[in-house]
Amino acid sequence: MDMRTPPNNTDAEKSILGGLLVQPEAFEVVSEILLPADFYRQVHQKLYQVMLELHNRKEPIDIVTVSNALTSKKELEQIGGSAVLADIMNEGPTAVNIEQYSRIVKEKSLLRKLIRVNT
């Protein structure tokens, strides 16, 4: 049995999420490429899901609204609290390469799916 870590790029995931917190208008590009399940880390899946819900309701996406939505769902502490949001925001101070990062995360997600199908 192969015990290697499945394909992932958590740096790209953090950069996407951080970029969306500082430049939410980039969500149009990202949402065309990624689904929450494409993120490797469950914390990142939850954060992206909340951002997607805010986006679909045409509500602003920022550290305050995401934190509030997570608190309402009783998930803020599950992801590690407000400190995790602040760390992610610092990881992605710009959304300049967000489309490329999204494609990297999608590619890794597809590779994980292929591995699951073939095992």
Q: What is each PLM-predicted segment?
A:
Residues R116-T119:
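A short N-terminal interaction module
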